[in-house]
């Protein structure tokens, strides 16, 4: 499943789950349709994207479950605590997101607790993340909150985007993940 976040009126969209390896080409086609637009107005909505991914309806069957979230961002994230201020600012600029997820964590610590399995839910929604099969892969800069997440959260790998110089570097990382997971 691919959640996608943008600024402005169309803040959120998501794909269906892709079953690997059977739907590999469908996933590739979907990824080719995603584009980056605008930018330069850090921070962005990366934490919301991560929270939505964590609330996905992950498969619960099978002996070896892997619930893998891969997040790409080139910017710091808005703190959850700034939500009210940000929505008021967006309204002043004439933006009213047509789709914005409900029940976001109240702060970063609530998100951390759900990831670590210390609580079954945030905002009264149950997560189906497998406590031993969850994996978080971050392609993110050395900015809030990504640098800390790479250290603080279990089963998490972070790659600094400034160290990635080409598509070949990402392909190498993905090949490593494919064999490691």
Q: What is the predicted role of each segment?
A:
Residues 1-4, 67-74, 137-140:
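Extended hydrophobic secondary-structure segments that form protein cores and membrane-embedded regions
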Residues 45, 141-144, 165:
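Short beta->alpha linker loops
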Residues 151-181:
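C-terminal "exit" segments of structured domains
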Residues 26-30, 49, 89, 107, ...:
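Alpha-helical scaffold elements adjacent to nucleotide-binding pockets in ATP/GTP-utilizing enzyme cores
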Residues 25, 62-68, 95-96, 129-136, ...:
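Loop/turn elements at helix/coil->beta-strand transitions in domains of secreted/extracellular proteins
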Residues 38-42, 114-117, 162:
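Short amphipathic alpha-helical molecular recognition features
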Residues 75-152:
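VWA/integrin I-like adhesion module and closely mimicked acidic/polar interface patches used
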């Amino acid at each position: 499943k691919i959640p996608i976040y943008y600024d402005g009126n169309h803040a959120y969209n998501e794909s269906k789950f892709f079953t690997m390896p059977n739907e590999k080409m469908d996933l590739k086609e979907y990824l080719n349709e995603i584009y980056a637009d605008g930018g330069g107005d850090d921070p962005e909505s990366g934490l919301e994207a991560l929270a939505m991914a964590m609330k996905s309806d992950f498969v619960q069957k099978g002996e070896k479950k892997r619930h893998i979230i891969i997040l790409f961002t080139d910017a710091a994230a808005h703190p959850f605590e700034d939500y009210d201020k940000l929505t008021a600012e967006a309204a002043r600029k004439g933006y009213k997101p047509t789709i914005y997820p409900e029940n976001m964590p109240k702060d970063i610590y609530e998100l951390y607790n759900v990831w670590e399995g210390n609580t079954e839910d945030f905002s009264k929604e149950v997560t189906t993340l497998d406590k031993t099969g969850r994996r978080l892969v971050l392609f993110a800069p050395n900015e809030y909150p990504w640098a800390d997440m790479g250290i603080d959260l279990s089963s998490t790998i972070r790659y600094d985007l400034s160290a990635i110089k080409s598509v070949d570097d990402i392909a190498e990382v993905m090949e490593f993940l494919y064999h490691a997971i």
